[in-house]
Each structure stands twice: as structure tokens, then as C-alpha cells.
Regions:
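Conserved alpha-helical scaffold segments that buttress catalytic/binding sites
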Residues: 2-375
Length: 375
């Protein structure tokens, strides 16, 4: 490889075939390989790699890309969202046997996963010695000068990978499968650099994620929205929906940080009115497209409890589907994500099946809102 790799060469270093972002030695490998073979329509590991490389080659002409970020290092005391991307893709293939063909028709390209070293979060938290050691482990065949510039942590890899994606296709819509909600940060950060129009973020979430830092950590699941709002200059383009688990009242956040919030009780009382008020707010600000960052815990825990911090008295799935559709019809959708789906967390026997199934419903609606066509 040349000292200065092309964007596609670098993406091939940073990413892995879909499902391959999890570092698996033996346990779980068979399930991972089955997913890859179904998604790429092949029968061997060598063919999987060829399918992955071919997908990268289609980025420039894609309308939307799918990226998995299987990291939950930015979460709290209950983990498991690192398994979200694989579970969501697997369920999607179960529901839509012809998904690979349909995706190709619609211009959806699955570019795979960020490779997630399971002990790391962001490169700015690491010593130079640690970065050097991990670079050598991840990129052993890359020349020293090129290797020294490569990121090693999930958030840092994702941010660089998305910068490269936008170099190849500045208007492509990113659709990201998390991962804890810290994994939305590299997406919105890269979008902020790539797009110069007035886009906004709509964030269904039980929590505000508006701490400036948490225990001294700048970017994690509880802080990413604060820093997103700073990128916007606190101008009201961050809209939060379904808030209900907060140390402070609505006025604290809206007056202090100039975010717009629709708390869960208001959404439950007047769902249609909330949707229209939300859209009206965005239109008045001149927003020309939204990134829909969908934390599954924004949904009531009766429907979505396989997650790190499930909360009752939340949003109903039909409300969120109606919101996604209305945003697609009005201001438009430039991308989105599904965050905090944690398949191992089963408070009830059917927790995983129900939560992952709902995540796939939201994912399909998000694609439809972006592409103006059903998936």
C-alpha cells in the first residue's frame, strides 16, 4: 500500500464486513459468519471479504450507507449494546429475505462495521504508547508513517471512516446501528463538517444526554448531545422527544442550553399536536433536513426493555413511526440511527425479540423517510 492510502484503501483498513466489528475468537463466530454469508449472498469467508470490498466501491453512488458501531464502552452500568448491530441486521434479514436485493435497488450500501477494540472508546483518552501498541495490532502491514496516523478506538475510527465516506459522496445519508448513544457523536460530528446546509437533530430519548462531561469523560452516552448542541451554536436545532428521566426540569435545559424538548407526558397526551409543533419549530428555524437519532429507551419499556436504561411511561411505537413519516414528508431526513439496543438484557423472556423487532421497524421507517420509498 502507498504511504498515503486512497479513501477506499483506508476504509478497508478501518472497517470490517458487516458483523465483523466484534472481536470474536471462537464463541459467537458461527453466528457472525452466518450473518455475513446471508448479507453478502456468499458461502465462504473469502467471498465475504470480496463482497465487503465491492460494497465499499459502491459508496460513491449510494443514496444511503449502513454502518455498524458495535461499542458500548461509553455506556453506564448495564452493557450489551455492542451486540445491537448484529442482532438488528439478523432480524432484518429474517423479516426481509430479499433485503440484499431490495437494498441494492434502493441505493442502500452496507459498508460494514467499525472494528471495536472492546476496552477502548476514544483516542483522546489514550496514551501515545497505547495508541502505538494498538495500531501495531490492528494495522500490522501498514508502513510506519501511514500507521501512525490511523485511529484505534471505536469513536475515533467511526469519525475518520465517515469523513472518508463524505469525501466519496458528500450527500449520502448515514444510517448507523449502535452501540451505546456515544456512537452518535462521530456521526453528527462528521455531518457537521460535511454539510453546510441548516440541518437539525431530532432525538427520541428518555434522557437528555446533555451533561458537559460525566466523571471527567467528555464524550459518552450522557454527554454527546451537549457537544452536538455546541456544534449548532445552541440555536434550537437540537430537538429532544420523550424526555422523562432527568435530574432537572424542562426549563433548566431549554433555558440554559436553548434546546427544544417535548417531554414524554406531553407526547402521550397530545401525540398529533406534538408532531405538528415539532415540525413547525424546525420549519421556523429554516431546517432543511434532520438526523433522527433514535435511542430505543425513548420508547416505553413495555415495548423496549432490552436496553441499558429502560424507562416506563415513554413513547409509544406508533407515535414514533408517525413522527418519522411526518419528518420525511416535511423537512426531510438526511440520516438516522438506532441506539442502545442491548440484546443480552432480558428483563422478561421476550425482551430481546420484542426490542430488536421494534428496532427493525424503526430502521425500515427511517430508510423509507430518507429515500421516499418503502423498504
Amino acid at each position: 500500500m502507498a504511504t498515503t492510502p486512497t479513501p477506499l484503501d483506508e476504509l478497508a483498513l478501518l472497517l470490517r464486513p458487516a458483523g465483523g466489528g466484534l472481536y470474536l475468537v471462537s464463541t459467537g463466530r458461527a453466528e457472525q459468519e452466518r450473518l455475513q454469508q446471508r448479507l453478502y449472498g456468499v458461502e465462504s469467508a473469502a467471498e465475504v471479504d470480496a463482497g465487503f470490498r465491492a460494497a465499499l466501491g459502491r459508496i460513491a453512488s449510494a443514496k444511503a450507507i449502513v454502518l455498524g458501531i458495535p461499542s458500548d464502552v461509553g455506556a453506564g452500568f448495564r452493557r450489551g449494546a455492542n451486540l445491537g448491530p448484529q442482532a438488528i441486521r439478523t432480524r432484518l434479514l429474517e423479516e426481509l429475505a430479499d433485503y440484499p436485493e431490495r437494498a441494492q435497488e434502493l441505493g442502500i450500501v452496507d459498508i460494514g462495521d467499525v472494528f471495536a477494540v472492546p476496552q477502548l472508546l476514544s483516542d483522546d483518552m489514550l496514551s501515545e504508547a497505547q495508541k502505538t501498541a494498538t495500531r501495531l495490532a490492528l494495522y500490522p502491514s501498514v508502513p510506519d508513517d501511514a500507521r501512525a496516523r490511523l485511529p484505534v478506538s471505536p469513536l475515533s475510527i467511526a469519525e475518520r471512516a465517515l469523513d472518508l465516506v463524505f469525501q466519496l459522496n458528500p450527500r449520502v445519508a448515514p444510517v448507523v446501528l449502535g452501540g451505546d448513544h456515544s456512537t452518535a457523536w462521530p456521526v453528527v460530528s462528521a455531518l457537521h463538517r460535511a454539510r453546510k446546509d441548516r440541518w437539525g437533530v431530532v432525538q427520541p430519548d428518555a434522557h437528555t444526554d446533555l451533561l458537559e462531561d460525566r466523571l471527567g469523560i467528555r464524550i459518552c452516552f450522557a454527554t454527546w448531545s451537549f457537544h452536538m448542541n455546541e456544534l449548532f451554536g445552541r440555536d434550537g436545532r437540537l430537538v429532544q422527544v420523550g424526555t422523562r428521566a432527568s435530574r432537572h426540569d424542562r426549563g433548566h435545559w431549554e433555558n440554559g442550553l436553548n434546546v427544544r424538548q417535548f417531554w414524554a407526558d406531553e407526547c402521550r397526551r397530545d401525540p398529533a399536536g406534538v408532531i405538528e409543533r415539532l415540525v413547525d419549530h424546525l420549519v421556523k428555524l429554516g431546517v432543511t433536513g434532520v438526523y433522527f437519532s433514535n435511542d430505543i429507551d425513548g420508547t416505553d419499556s413495555a415495548w423496549a426493555d432490552a436496553t441499558g436504561t429502560p424507562e416506563p411511561e415513554g413513547l409509544e411505537p406508533d407515535f414514533l413511526v408517525a413522527l418519522i413519516r411526518r419528518l420525511g414528508e416535511t423537512v426531510g431526513m438526511i440520516g438516522g440511527d438506532i441506539m442502545e439496543v442491548a440484546p443480552p438484557l432480558r428483563d422478561r423472556p421476550d425482551s430481546t425479540e420484542r426490542t430488536v423487532g421494534l428496532a427493525v421497524r424503526y430502521l425500515r421507517e427511517t430508510f423509507s423517510a430518507i429515500l421516499k420509498q418503502p423498504l
